[in-house]
């Protein structure tokens, strides 16, 4: 039985390669039949905002990779992180079909998984 893995995205999408590399790792895990759970919290919430155009700034777009991960493993966003940033679920990209969860539920995800990796 594969290990249960939780990938926590808490960094903003731009300014470093941390998040992009995290999405690459998640994609590689899926290719190895490990289906990680993805949790977006803190500034990681900004990865999920609709109408982003990183290529306009010369940055790599992660939209298709994240959409694929959404289709395969699902994406969870902490509701409190949205609210703290003045965001609503309507601000999230519909392509990602994000499930908003409470901080208590996010804590449950931490407990349920054997391995936790943070980006």
Residue ranges and their predicted role:
Residues 42-45, 81-82:
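Short beta-alpha junction loops
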Residues 2-6:
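Extreme N-terminal starter segment of soluble prokaryotic enzymes
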Residues 51-56, 92-96:
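Short glycine-enriched, charge-decorated loop/helix-capping segments at active-site entrances
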Residues 113:
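An anion/phosphate-binding loop that grips the pyrophosphate of nucleotide cofactors and donors
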Residues 7-20, 48-53:
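Short, glycine-rich nucleotide/cofactor-binding loops
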Residues 97-104:
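Short acidic-hydrophobic, aromatic-tinged amphipathic segments that line or gate anion-handling sites
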């Amino acid at each position: 039985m594969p290990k249960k893995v939780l990938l926590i995205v808490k960094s903003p999408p731009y300014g470093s390669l941390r998040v992009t590399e995290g999405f690459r790792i998640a994609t590689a895990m899926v290719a190895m039949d490990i289906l990680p759970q993805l949790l977006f919290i803190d500034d990681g919430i900004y990865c999920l905002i609709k109408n982003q155009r990183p290529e306009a700034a010369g940055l790599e777009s992660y939209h298709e990779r994240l959409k694929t991960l959404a289709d395969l493993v699902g994406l969870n966003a902490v509701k409190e992180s949205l609210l703290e940033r003045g965001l609503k679920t309507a601000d999230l990209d519909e392509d990602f079909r994000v499930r908003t969860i409470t901080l208590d539920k996010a804590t449950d995800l931490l407990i349920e998984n054997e391995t936790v990796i943070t980006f």
